Amino acid sequence: MIEHTTIALLSGGIDSATAACIAMEAGQKVIGLSFDYGQRHLKELQAAADLAKNLNLEDHITIKIDLSSWGGSSLTDTSQAIPTQGIQKNTIPNTYVPGRNTIFVAIGLSLAEARGANRIALGINAMDYSGYPDCRPDYLKAYQELANLSSRVGREGNGIKLWAPLLDWEKTKIFEEALRLKIPIEKTWSCYQGESKPCGKCDSCRIRDKALKEIGREDLCSQNI
């Protein structure tokens, strides 16, 4: 296995971009992996491509897998409305996409083993998305066990690490780190709506804007992009 190569699941948002840059700063070669999964907010794919180029990643691969074929989420089924009433506590919002992270990580593991990468960088964040079942520490721990059991390198004792450096970070800390790393925040995309401009009302926009205001960077909020 070639050491110091990371597969970064790159959505086009601030979390995945920050995780990728932390890996690069640590001396890792980074291969970006993005997914066209039938999401209504396709603009995130252009953001991912722009970020991959701007960050000078080793490679950037986009995989098409149509999760909109069966829907189950407002992100993949346009007949369902994106929630705009504000973040609801203790509930899983309809923006949760069934099995999405599980599928993405599985593909990432395949790519990592094929390319000789030793870890996968995930931008998942339990602090902001505590309602999502696949962004929690127990999910990550269980998937790591599966990854070790389901791969040749894992069985040989050289398992691919599922690495989520932002798992317990507040959103303000993520943006502060992104600024330190000189990530072009204005090139990232967070909005769930499939419009040309961020809506400023969906949960993702609200979380982003709140954090940016708290660190004094209102100039990067959704209404200014």
Swiss-Prot record:
Domain of life: Bacteria
Residues that hold Zn(2+) according to the record: C191, C199, C202, C205
A GO molecular-function annotation: ligase activity, forming carbon-nitrogen bonds
CDD domains, sorted: QueC-like
Protein name: 7-cyano-7-deazaguanine synthase
A biological-process GO annotation: queuosine biosynthetic process
Keyword Metal-binding: yes
Organism: Prochlorococcus marinus (strain NATL2A)
Statement: the UniProt record of this protein carries the keyword rRNA processing: no
Membership in a protein family: Belongs to the QueC family.
UniProt-listed Pfam families: QueC
InterPro entries linked: QueC, Rossmann-like_a/b/a_fold
Cofactor annotation comment: Binds 1 zinc ion per subunit.
Annotated keywords: ATP-binding, Ligase, Metal-binding, Nucleotide-binding, Queuosine biosynthesis, Zinc
Purpose of the protein: Catalyzes the ATP-dependent conversion of 7-carboxy-7-deazaguanine (CDG) to 7-cyano-7-deazaguanine (preQ(0)).
